C-alpha cells in the first residue's frame, strides 16, 4: 500500500496536534503552489533499509532541505511527515510506505519512505514498481543486516539501481569501515566509496567527498556546511579512494576506459557518467555518509541523485 502525505495551503501535513508535539511547523510548499514539471525533471526515490536505519528521519531531512517544512520532526516526538498514523506513533516505526515530495535544484523529488520490516514487504514491492532508484540505508553500528538482504532482493527482482547511504554515523558505536566490509561481503552489487567520515561517533560533523575532492564540515544540525580543502593528514587516503572511484567508473564503459588509459584519470563529469552507467547496469552502489538526525550529508546526497 502506498500512501500520499498531502499538503494544503496554510496547513501542515496530517500529524500530531500541536498539544501532542513539542513544536508546530509550517508547510512552506503546498502542492497547489508547485510549478509544472516534465517527466525528465521528476525523480522517484525509494528509501529502503532494515528496520532502524533511519529512513523516516532522512526523508524528514530531505523535505527540510527542499523547504517543504521549516523545522524537522522526529520519531520520538511523533511528528514526522511520513509516520503520521496512531499505530505508527504507538510502535515508533513505519507501517506504511508514504509518498512525500520536495523541490530541489529545479527538480521535483518524490520520496517514498518504506517500512523496514519484512512484515510489510508488500508496500516495498509497490514502491519499487514506480521508483527510479533505491536509496539503501545502513545503520553505521550494524552494517549489513538480515533485513538488508530482504530489501536488496526486491531491488534485484525489480531491476532497480541502488545508492548506498551509511547513516547514523553520529552513533556511539558507528563503524564506517566495518559497515563497508559487511556490504562487500553480502551484497551482489559492488559498493564504491564516494564519501567517508572524518570523525565518526558522537562528534561526527565532517566527511570527505572523493568525487569532488573536498571536505565538508557541518554545524548547528541544520544542514549548513563549509566546503574545505582536504587536510594533509587525510590526503593519501582521499587520493587512494579517488583512484578506486575513477577505476570503477571507467570499467563500465569502453570509451571511458580508453580515456582513462590515455590520460590516467577522469574528470568529475566523466566519473559521474561512469557511475550512472554502473548504476543503470546494477553493478555499482555509490556509498554516501549521513546523519539524518543532524541533517549531515543530506543535501550532498540529493545533489548526486539529481546530477
Regions found by a protein language model. Give the residues of each.
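Intrinsic-disorder-associated, low-complexity terminal segments enriched in Asp/Asn/His/Tyr and depleted
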Residues: 11, 23-24, 33
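Short polybasic linear motifs
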Residues: 6, 13, 17, 21-22
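Acidic, low-complexity intrinsically disordered tails
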Residues: 7, 26-31
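P-loop NTPase switch module centered on the Walker A-proximal segment
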Residues: 32-138, 142-144, 193
Amino acid at each position: 500500500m502506498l500512501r500520499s502525505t498531502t499538503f494544503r495551503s496554510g496547513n501542515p501535513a496530517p500529524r500530531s496536534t500541536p498539544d501532542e508535539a513539542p513544536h508546530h511547523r509550517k508547510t512552506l510548499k503546498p502542492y497547489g503552489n508547485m510549478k509544472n514539471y516534465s517527466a525528465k525533471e521528476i525523480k522517484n526515490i525509494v528509501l529502503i533499509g532494515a528496520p532502524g536505519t533511519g529512513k523516516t528521519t532522512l526523508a524528514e531531512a530531505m523535505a527540510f532541505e527542499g523547504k517543504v517544512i521549516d523545522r524537522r520532526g522526529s520519531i520520538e516526538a511523533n511528528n514526522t511527515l511520513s509516520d503520521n498514523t496512531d499505530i505508527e506513533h504507538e510502535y515508533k516505526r513505519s507501517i506504511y510506505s508514504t509518498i512525500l515530495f520536495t523541490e530541489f535544484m529545479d527538480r521535483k523529488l518524490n520520496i517514498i519512505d518504506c517500512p523496514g520490516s519484512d512484515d510489510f514487504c508488500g508496500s516495498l514491492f509497490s514502491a519499487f514498481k514506480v521508483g527510479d532508484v533505491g536509496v539503501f540505508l545502513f545503520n553505521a553500528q550494524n552494517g549489513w543486516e538480515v533485513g538488508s538482504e530482504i530489501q536488496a532482493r526486491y531491488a534485484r527482482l525489480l531491476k532497480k539501481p541502488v545508492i548506498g547511504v551509511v547513516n547514523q554515523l553520529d552513533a556511539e558505536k558507528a563503524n564506517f569501515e566495518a559497515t563497508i566490509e559487511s556490504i562487500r561481503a553480502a551484497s551482489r552489487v559492488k559498493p564504491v566509496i564516494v564519501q567517508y567520515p572524518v570523525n565518526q561517533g558522537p562528534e561526527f560533523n565532517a566527511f570527505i567527498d572523493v568525487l569532488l575532492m573536498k571536505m565538508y564540515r557541518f554545524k548547528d544540525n541544520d544542514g549548513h556546511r563549509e566546503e574545505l580543502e582536504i587536510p594533509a593528514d587525510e590526503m593519501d587516503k582521499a587520493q587512494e579512494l579517488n583512484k578506486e572511484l575513477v577505476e570503477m567508473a571507467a570499467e563500465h564503459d569502453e570509451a571511458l576506459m580508453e580515456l582513462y588509459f590515455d590520460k590516467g584519470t577522469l574528470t568529475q563529469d566523466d566519473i559521474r557518467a561512469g557511475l550512472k552507467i554502473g548504476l543503470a547496469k546494477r553493478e555499482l552502489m555509490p556509498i554516501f555518509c549521513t546523519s539524518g538526525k543532524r541533517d549531515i550529508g543530506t543535501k550532498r546526497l540529493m545533489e548526486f541523485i539529481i546530477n
